[in-house]
């Protein structure tokens, strides 16, 4: 999908050790620009999770990300958003879809370009129920500058404290109250 020369070029911009990680990082970055360059998606979804934390608030990134975690910030039917995400990420092919009560996940699969050929995956998971937020939404400029893809957008996300709080809530076990 991505010529090896462009993956090697991206290797100079990211701290990852394997070419598969570099390739997947470039795919994630393009996917973010594709999603948040679309007005409907940018006004209906917010980026959160480890990818938001490490791509937007730490330089250089401290942790490798394999997925995109989104939250639907508007109470509206999700079907049109799924269709639009699929359109924007058409360069990845047709996703496997996994709808659940509170989220909708799309799995895009592709093969790495450098031998040994490996199956890579991009998971785009959207929480479809948390429309209310205490943490203020913000827009953060984001760009990809590669010979394979160039683009920029303003990512809709949460302030640093909101992302950290969400990450902490995800790792603290839920205790049942008596």
Tell me what each language-model feature is.
Residues 20, 24, 81:
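Hydrophobic (often cysteine-bearing) scaffold residues that line and stabilize catalytic clefts
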Residues 31-41, 84, 88-92:
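Generic non-transmembrane alpha-helical segments
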Residues 58-60, 95-99, 109-115:
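Catalytic micro-motifs at enzyme active sites that drive phosphoryl/nucleotidyl and oxygen chemistry
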Residues 8, 14-15, 19, 29-33, ...:
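Catalytic cores of NTP-dependent nucleotidyl/adenyl transfer enzymes across multiple folds
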Residues 72-106:
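Metal-dependent nucleotidyltransferase catalytic core
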Residues 1-10:
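Terminal (often C-terminal) interaction modules
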Residues 36-68, 73:
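Active-site nucleotide-donor binding segment shared across nucleotidyl transfer reactions
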């Amino acid at each position: 999908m991505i010529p090896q020369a462009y993956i090697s070029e991206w290797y100079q911009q990211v701290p990852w050790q394997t070419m598969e990680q570099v390739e997947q990082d470039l795919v994630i970055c393009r996917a973010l620009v594709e999603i948040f360059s679309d007005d409907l998606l940018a006004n209906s979804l917010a980026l959160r999770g480890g990818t938001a934390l490490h791509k937007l608030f730490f330089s250089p990134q401290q942790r490798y990300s394999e997925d995109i975690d989104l939250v639907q910030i508007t109470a509206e039917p999700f079907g049109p958003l799924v269709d639009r995400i699929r359109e924007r990420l058409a360069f990845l092919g047709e996703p496997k879809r996994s709808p659940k009560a509170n989220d909708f996940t799309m799995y895009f699969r592709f093969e790495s370009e450098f031998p040994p050929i490996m199956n890579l995956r991009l998971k785009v998971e959207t929480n479809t129920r948390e429309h209310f937020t205490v943490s203020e939404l913000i827009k953060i400029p984001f760009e990809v500058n590669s010979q394979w893809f160039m683009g920029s957008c303003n990512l809709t996300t949460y302030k640093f404290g909101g992302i950290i709080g969400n990450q902490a809530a995800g790792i603290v076990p839920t205790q049942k109250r008596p």
